[in-house]
Design a protein with these regions (language model features):
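Conserved acidic, metal-coordinating active-site core of Asp-based
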Residues: 98, 102-218
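Asp-based phosphoryl-transfer active-site loop
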Residues: 3-17
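Short, structured coil segments at secondary-structure junctions
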Residues: 56, 61, 174-176, 230-231, ...
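Mg2+-dependent phosphoryl-transfer enzymes with acidic/Ser/Thr/Gly-rich catalytic loops
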Residues: 1-4, 21, 189-269
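Active-site phosphate-binding/coordination module
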Residues: 22-123
Length: 269
């Protein structure tokens, strides 16, 4: 019996127009009415989730969101932090040094800010900020490492070829010290070592006294793999890569074909 539904957002809950299909909203409400807990699990920062959560119309429910690829977990009753992992000043200095050696640009996130290091943000960073409804805040390395901010996650952004080059040159080294993932063609992410959506989901499930076997997780991208494998039932979207599909227990329709609703109807309702 499924007691917790863990949903990725981009490419899963959201269609290609970055909207939540009505079929998904309806199915989620039906699942919650059956007692299933909803946990949105996303690489987005919290401020990139809030407008969508409001659209779901779950104001009277206390659900959870896991953001920044597992770095922070919030309860929706007051949006307070219930669990988090953060980068140390030494971590930030290391990531900054990698960015300085490459053509990508480093960004950092705390609960409220989308920070940019190393000068004016490139066009790709600006586009990403627009997608998560955020202004950009330029910050110096000195201020970023001052301890004033709780920095959850770093992201390197550049063109696809620039990000290819960064990954080829530095991913092997970086992944010895951080949890790194190429989440999008133009983004390489770095979280505190051992941090994934799955680790955050595991800790939350323990708090809620829910077993992994009672969790259904859905996703489409590389940063969803650990979560799909952790859950008792891991569902890949029809728009996922063949590799992600091969690691899932089942494949549903795409995010353009109400894939989330179809899976909820099949396994929960």
């Amino acid at each position: 019996m499924i007691k917790l539904l863990a949903l990725d957002m981009d490419g899963t809950l959201l269609n290609e127009a970055k909207e939540i299909p009505q079929a998904h909203i309806t199915a989620i409400h039906q699942a919650i009415e059956k007692g299933v807990k909803l946990v949105l699990c996303t690489g987005r920062p919290l401020f990139g989730v809030l407008p969508y959560y409001k659209q779901l119309g779950l104001d009277l429910q206390n659900e959870y969101v896991i953001v920044n690829n597992g770095c922070s977990t919030h309860q929706t009753s007051d949006w307070g932090l219930v669990d988090w992992q953060e980068l140390s000043p030494a971590d930030i200095e290391y990531l900054y040094d990698l960015a300085e050696k490459s053509d990508v640009q480093l960004t950092l996130f705390d609960e409220e800010h989308y920070f940019v290091l190393g000068g004016k943000p490139n066009e790709i960073i600006q586009n990403d900020a627009d997608l998560v409804f955020s202004d950009l805040t330029e910050i110096s390395l000195e201020e970023a490492t001052s301890g004033k901010y709780r920095m959850f996650q770093g992201m390197f952004l550049g063109t696809e070829s620039q990000t290819d080059d960064f990954e080829k040159r530095f991913a092997g080294e970086l992944c010895k010290l951080f949890s790194g993932v190429r989440s999008q063609p133009v983004i390489y992410e770095a979280m505190p070592l051992g941090t994934t959506k799955a680790t955050a989901l595991s800790r939350l499930a323990e708090i809620l006294n829910i077993e992994a076997s009672e969790i259904m997780a859905m996703g489409d991208a590389n940063n969803d793999i650990e979560m799909l494998q952790f859950a008792g039932l891991g569902i890949a979207m029809g728009n996922a890569s063949d590799y992600v599909k091969s690691l899932a227990d089942d494949v549903t329709a795409s995010n353009e074909e109400d894939g989330v609703a179809r899976a909820i109807e099949k396994y929960i309702l």
